[in-house]
């Protein structure tokens, strides 16, 4: 690690501390990038390639990835346009995700909440988020319920702790950690996210979530219809 020419930091919290220490001890430069979303991933590749003076190779890679994955992304974007999403993740991932899903998928981020966010995370969230978006720091369950009632999201991008909670409200969630169906990084990964968001929002079983199966009359009526 100490022989590297460059440290590329994606998670600005844990790996950032390591990169700062390596810069202090060994003089290795630190470069921060985002790897979620097509626009941010392309920007990150350009930064890395510019550092090493291989811009042409970077542009060729970006062109190949766009040709391979952009048509699939556009298919999902057309069907997710205007979807209302709440993002409840760790501090750094808030500002990684909010603009990428809005710009690359046409999703409207209506609320955000962070765990373990630092001041710099808040500043980036404010800079990237749109005016009128609600932001909660270290929200509890009661605050989550209140904000859900207020903004009425179609889907929530979060972890299992909050995700399993909101399922009781019949609201789908996408596991932001990506270990169910991910990864969500890079061009292919962002298509995975688009796919999972589409499947969550357009799942035909959503309409059945609120039916009380103990009400036999309601079930019979549904079957007759």
What are these regions (language model features)?
Residues 1-225:
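An N-terminal assembly and electron-transfer interface module characteristic of large anaerobic redox
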């Amino acid at each position: 690690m100490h022989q590297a020419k460059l440290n590329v930091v994606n998670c600005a919290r844990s790996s950032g501390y390591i990169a700062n220490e390596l810069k202090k001890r060994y003089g290795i430069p630190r470069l921060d990038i985002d790897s979620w979303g097509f626009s941010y991933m392309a920007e990150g590749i350009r930064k890395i390639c510019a550092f090493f003076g291989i811009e042409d190779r970077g542009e060729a890679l970006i062109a190949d990835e766009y040709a391979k994955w952009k048509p699939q992304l556009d298919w999902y974007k057309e069907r997710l346009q205007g979807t209302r999403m709440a993002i409840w993740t760790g501090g750094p991932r808030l500002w990684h995700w909010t603009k990428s899903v809005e710009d690359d998928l046409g999703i409207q981020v209506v609320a955000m909440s962070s765990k373990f966010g630092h001041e710099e995370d808040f500043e980036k969230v404010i800079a990237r988020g749109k005016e009128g978006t609600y932001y909660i720091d270290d929200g509890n369950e009661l605050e989550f319920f209140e904000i859900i009632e207020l903004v009425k999201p179609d889907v929530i991008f979060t972890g299992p702790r909050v995700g399993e909670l909101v399922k009781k409200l019949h609201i789908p969630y996408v596991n932001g950690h990506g270990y169910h169906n991910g990864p969500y990084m890079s061009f292919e990964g962002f298509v995975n996210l688009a796919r999972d968001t589409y499947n969550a929002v357009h799942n035909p079983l959503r309409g059945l979530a609120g039916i009380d199966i103990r009400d036999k009359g309601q079930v019979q009526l549904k079957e007759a219809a």
